[in-house]
C-alpha cells in the first residue's frame, strides 16, 4: 500500500492515559467503566489483550466489565499491569449480563468454553477457529440451529485493506472473478478471504491438495521480541490449491514467518474476466475495451507508544483508502490508535453487540465459520497424506 499522509502522536500506555466514567455495578457492587456495549473476556492470554486495548481505545463505545482468569495469581497480574477488573468467578461474570462474552482461550478449548457460556444464555464472540474437529463443528451447528448466539471472530474480511479491495472488486471493475492467489493469512483465515474474494458460498464443495515445504529463513520478529543478530532457522511454507465445484480456484501460499516478518510480503492477486487486482494495483478494461491501470492508495495515521513490545511500539492505523478518486474506506468511528487487526476486531465487537440485541444480523455467520474451520481440517489432511481431498458439505445440513 502507498502512504500518502503520515501523522504521528506520542502517547503513554493506554492503561495510564485514559480516564473513564465509572459507576457501581448492580450485580456485584464493583466500580465499572460505563460504555455503550458491555462485554467480558474469558481468558487472559496474548489474544485476549487485543480486546482490552480496544476497550481502552473506545471507552465511549465499550465497557469491559471483567476479565475471567483461572487463577488469582493471573488475575492479580493482569489487573495490575492493565488497570482493569479481573475475577476468578464465573458467576460474577455472568451476573454482569454482558452483551457478549469474548472466548479467548487455547484453541483446543474454544468450542467447549463457547458452549459453556452459551448454556448460560450469553452471546459469545469466540476466537478462531470455531473448532478443531468435525464432531465439535457439528455440535456448534446444533447450538446455532437451537437458537443459541455465537459469532466467531473471523476478522480478516473486516480489515480496512480487505474491505476496500472487496468493495472495489464488487463494483464489477474486473468482471466476474474466477481465480486468485493469496499469500496473506493462514488456514481458516485464508479460506475466509478466498471465499470472500471469489464469492463462494459456505456450502460450496471443493477439492484441496497441498504440500508443506521448509526453507531456511532469517528470523526477525515474534509476538514478543525482535531479533537483529541474523539468526537463521528452517521455516514452514504451505502451498495448496482449492478447486471449487463452481469452477473457481484459489491458490493458497502461507509462510510461517509471514504475519510479522518484514522480509515476507503479504500479497493478493485476484483475476476476473475483464481485469485483475494485484495488491495495490488494479488492471482493467474500460467501456471501450482498452486497458487501464489504477493504484489503490492508502493513508496511515502513525501512533508511537511506549509499549516495550516491538509489535505495539508503532501503530499504523488506516486513515483512508481510495482508488481513482473514489473513497473505498474511512474509519467509521474515527481514529482510535488501533492497528488493522484491532480495527477489524472492534468492528466485529460492535456488530456482535447489535446482534445480541436483535438490532442486526450476525456479523459472521456460523455457517461461514464452520466452512472455514472445516476447510482448514481438510487442508491439513491433504498436506499430511499427500492426497487430493474432497469436501462433503452435506453434514452441515444434517
Task: Give each language-model segment a name.
Residues 98-100, 106-107, 111-158:
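Beta-strand-loop-alpha-helix segment that lines the small-molecule cofactor/substrate pocket
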Residues 160-179:
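Rossmann-like NAD(P)H-binding beta-loop-alpha module
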Residues 28-82, 96:
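N-terminal Rossmann-like dinucleotide-binding module
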Residues 17, 26-32, 36, 77-79, ...:
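C-terminal helix-rich "cap/oligomerization" subdomain common to oxidoreductases
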Residues 85-96:
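Short acidic low-complexity segments
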Residues 4, 8-11, 15-16, 21-22:
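N-terminal amphipathic/hydrophobic targeting modules at extreme N-termini
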Residues 176-269, 283-285, 367, 371, ...:
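Rossmann-like dinucleotide-binding domain that binds NAD(P)(H)
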Residues 231, 244, 258, 269, ...:
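C-terminal glycine/acidic-rich active-site capping loop/insertion
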Amino acid at each position: 500500500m502507498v502512504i500518502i499522509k503520515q501523522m504521528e502522536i506520542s502517547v503513554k500506555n493506554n492503561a495510564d492515559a485514559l480516564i473513564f466514567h465509572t459507576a457501581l455495578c448492580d450485580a456485584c457492587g464493583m466500580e465499572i467503566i460505563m460504555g455503550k456495549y458491555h462485554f467480558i473476556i474469558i481468558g487472559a492470554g496474548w489474544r485476549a489483550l487485543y480486546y482490552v486495548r480496544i476497550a481502552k481505545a473506545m471507552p465511549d463505545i465499550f465497557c469491559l466489565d471483567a476479565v475471567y482468569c483461572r487463577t488469582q495469581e493471573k488475575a492479580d497480574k493482569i489487573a495490575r499491569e492493565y488497570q482493569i477488573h479481573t475475577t476468578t468467578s464465573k458467576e460474577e461474570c455472568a451476573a454482569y449480563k454482558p452483551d457478549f462474552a469474548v472466548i479467548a482461550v487455547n484453541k483446543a478449548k474454544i468450542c467447549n468454553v463457547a458452549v459453556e457460556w452459551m448454556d448460560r444464555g450469553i452471546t459469545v464472540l469466540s476466537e478462531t477457529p470455531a473448532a478443531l474437529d468435525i464432531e465439535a463443528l457439528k455440535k456448534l451447528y446444533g447450538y446455532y440451529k437451537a437458537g443459541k448466539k455465537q459469532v466467531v471472530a473471523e476478522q480478516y474480511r473486516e480489515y480496512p485493506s480487505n474491505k476496500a479491495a472487496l468493495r472495489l472488486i464488487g463494483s464489477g471493475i474486473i468482471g466476474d472473478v474466477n481465480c486468485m492467489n493469496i499469500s496473506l493469512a493462514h488456514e481458516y483465515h485464508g479460506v475466509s478471504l478466498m471465499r470472500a474474494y471469489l464469492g463462494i458460498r459456505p456450502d460450496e464443495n471443493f477439492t484441496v491438495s497441498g504440500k508443506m515445504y521448509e526453507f531456511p529463513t532469517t528470523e526477525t520478529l515474534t509476538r514478543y521480541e525482535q531479533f537483529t543478530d541474523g539468526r537463521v532457522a528452517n521455516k514452514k511454507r504451505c502451498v495448496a490449491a482449492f478447486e471449487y465445484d463452481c469452477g473457481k480456484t484459489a491458490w493458497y501460499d502461507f509462510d510461517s514467518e509471514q504475519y510479522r516478518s518484514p522480509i515476507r510480503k503479504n500479497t493478493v492477486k485476484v483475476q476476473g474476466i475483464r481485469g485483475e487486482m494485484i495488491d495495490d494495483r488494479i488492471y482493467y478494461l474500460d467501456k471501450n475495451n482498452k486497458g487501464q491501470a489504477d493504484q489503490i492508495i492508502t493513508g496511515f495515521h502513525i501512533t508511537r507508544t511506549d509499549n516495550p513490545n516491538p509489535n505495539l511500539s508503532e501503530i499504523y492505523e488506516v486513515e483512508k483508502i481510495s482508488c481513482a478518486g473514489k473513497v473505498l474506506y474511512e474509519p467509521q468511528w474515527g481514529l482510535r490508535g488501533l492497528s488493522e487487526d484491532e480495527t477489524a476486531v472492534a468492528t466485529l465487537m460492535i456488530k456482535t453487540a447489535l446482534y445480541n440485541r436483535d438490532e442486526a444480523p450476525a456479523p459472521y455467520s456460523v455457517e461461514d465459520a464452520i466452512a472455514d474451520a472445516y476447510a482448514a481440517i481438510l487442508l491439513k489432511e491433504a498436506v499430511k497424506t499427500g492426497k487430493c481431498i474432497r469436501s462433503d458439505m452435506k453434514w452441515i445440513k444434517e
